[in-house]
């Protein structure tokens, strides 16, 4: 489903990824393991379109993602939960979830059903639905970040340091 071939990514003159190739199969859990500085986050940012690959190919179900803007990559089904969570601190939990479905807002009834499903899946969020996300504990913010990402109905969920929090 996700095929990465000979990907090279740089931060200016610093070459961070050199010839990375891997595949992630549908229905399988794929983990990237390595020490700090190995390029795990850089690879996820490159897949998500936040960083641009200088060379190589990233395909989701045969469709090339390299060169696509991040919002288009999200539309294609790839969603990133970054290491630092990046919840909207001044917005309530419910609105954070709604933000995760921003590309699907044309069907508000379906989005509302998905919000309810996230409240069921992550019960701690229900009791905090009207509470600003910035007041949640680190673990609760991580839970919210994952739930918000799932609101986009991803085919691939990229999670950077998912147990941090």
Predicted regions and their residues:
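The feature captures the beta-strand-to-loop junction immediately N-terminal to the Walker
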Residues: 33-35
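ABC-type ATPase nucleotide-binding domains, specifically the catalytic core motifs of the NBD
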Residues: 12, 30, 68, 91-110, ...
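Conserved ABC transporter NBD signature motif
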Residues: 56-65, 76, 110-115
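Helix-to-loop junction immediately C-terminal to a conserved catalytic motif
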Residues: 48
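ABC ATPase C-loop
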Residues: 149-150
